[in-house]
Amino acid sequence: MASSQVGDMVNGNAEPTRHLAKFPPSLWGDRFTSFTLDKQLSDKYGNEIEVLKEQVRSMVVAGGRKAVEQINLINVLERLGVSYHFEKEIEEQLEQLFAKFEDNEDYDLFTIALHFRIFRQHGYKMSCDVFNKFRDSNGEFKETVSNDVQGMLSLYEATYLKIRGEGFLDEAHAFTIAQLESLVGGPHLSSDLSEQVMHALKQSIHRGFPRLEAKHFISFYEKDASRNETLLRLAKLDFNQLQLSHREELCHIFRWWKELDLISKVPYARDRAVECFFWSTCAYYEPQHSVGRAVLTKIMLLLSVTDDTYDAYGTYDEVKLYTNAVQRWDVSAMDELPDYMKALYRALLNVYDEVERDLAKQGRAYGVHHSKEAFKEIVRSYEIEAEWFKEGYVVSFEEYMKNALVTSTGRLHTTSCFMGLEADVATTEAFEWILTKPKMVATSGAIGRLVDDVMSHDEEQERGHVATGLDCYMKQHGVSKQEAIVELYKMIENAWRDINEEMLKPTAISMKLLIRVLNLSRISDVVYKYVDGYTHPEIIKDHVISLFEDPIPM
């Protein structure tokens, strides 16, 4: 947190010393300022999509198909990114398939692992004992497994659905990674299969950004000799049509952000309108959630600037004033703020008023109160961190995490995300569930907080920053930075296990809500996997271009 070394002067003439972050500027210039939707092309795509959807729907519900064929069809639909059109039909099929599933000795590793992954993704708790037949009397994997590349790849993907206490899946994860890495680029893999393996090792299905992973899979599927041309055509059309819609939405958001002109008044902050929309599109990409994407993006942008204000510019006295103003949530509180904070505070109040008006038209404004309260909670926790930095405190890891579970934004992002869902899904009970501090939301926030602490540690400490979870763990346990990183990654993996378990039936709330929390967790894996891709947007630039600019060749 930024502190004053000269003196915490809010309205005096002397400018206090500030620990400026010097964040990289926006990458995009005016690139997304204008976009004209090709209505004729969009309508053409839409008409053909409707015809193909009915053909595929008939395939999904058709009787007489073997269970293996049905699970393979569902897998292809999901990986192509078109399963959202057939949610009801797929759930009905999976319920029947799970009830009738038998561990048939004829099923190979690929098929067993595929069943395991698909069932668990949909909340069905298939036991990992189904993999026992692939181990010898010593508990080691049989030699035949090492020769089955597709089987190992399927098992590798399945291991990401593990929960606590499933040591076998930990062993399988390490085993398949080692085996697959040894095969990449070797003579035993075709170039296409080698490319699939390399991508899987870089980004798993379960933790990936659904729309990006769909685009990758489409490129693999069209080279598959056994491909279904109807499915492939639907996937390409669907991706391109949604891309047109997302691009138009991004243009509206980008222009709104430019017209708000907040960054010119707070130039110390990260300018990340495009990246926030990218984030929101991961939370929900489906066409019916356009309002939700806009709402979530705007709130994320305001939170990002607020975070940078506490983290990389504001003095302790200044941020205390801002915290108090946010708690009051009243325009009269602006009078007590320094000029640069007035612009941010005005934007905060105006955006929430705008969001409330838009959602009121659809009878969904009840969630706005919950989002405001979550925002208030976060700035209180930001102030706690500012005090720690001012006093030079390195608190215990447990105390750090208690506060970090708030600053990780899990509650705010989940609440704001729910505001964009249909009223019959995001009910008042759904928002009340968030208030109970459920494990699903807490662990989602913990993943984001811990991986960010690891990836941004060196840069933040160089400029002056409150002690992160990494620092607190190192001091408390007397370990090296590398040893602390290992332990934090163990915590991250356990958090993923908890998320997986929370999504097994019976669930606390609708799976339609839980999948949004899962998607918010996935963002951390994609954006912070190797470096802080939000602070350094060039890291995810190719993802943004792939998602919003580059169509799939038809």
Curated annotation (Swiss-Prot):
Species of provenance: Camellia hiemalis
Annotated cofactor note: Binds 3 Mg(2+) ions per subunit.
Binding site for Mg(2+) 1: D307, D311
Enzyme's top EC category: lyase
Free-text comment about domains: The Asp-Asp-Xaa-Xaa-Asp/Glu (DDXXD/E) motif is important for the catalytic activity, presumably through binding to Mg(2+).
Record's function text: Terpene synthase that catalyzes the biosynthesis of the terpene valerianol, which is a volatile compound of floral scent.
Gene3D superfamilies per UniProt: Farnesyl Diphosphate Synthase, Terpene synthase, N-terminal domain
Pathway: Secondary metabolite biosynthesis; terpenoid biosynthesis
Keyword Magnesium appears in the UniProt entry: yes
Motif DDXXD motif in this chain: 326-330
Reaction(s) the record says it catalyses: (2E,6E)-farnesyl diphosphate + H2O = valerianol + diphosphate
Binding site for Mg(2+) 3: D452, S456, E460
Cofactors demanded by this protein: Mg(2+)
Keywords, in A-Z order: Lyase, Magnesium, Metal-binding
Molecular functions per Gene Ontology: carbon-oxygen lyase activity, acting on phosphates; magnesium ion binding; terpene synthase activity
Protein name: Valerianol synthase TPS1G
InterPro entries: Isoprenoid_synthase_dom_sf, Terpene_cyclase-like_1_C, Terpene_cyclase_plant_C1, Terpene_synth_N, Terpene_synth_N_sf, Terpene_synthase-like, Terpene_synthase_metal-bd, Terpenoid_cyclase/PrenylTrfase
Residue positions binding Mg(2+) 2: D307, D311
Similarity remark: Belongs to the terpene synthase family.
Enzyme Commission number(s) from the entry: 4.2.3.204
Gene Ontology BP term (one): sesquiterpenoid biosynthetic process
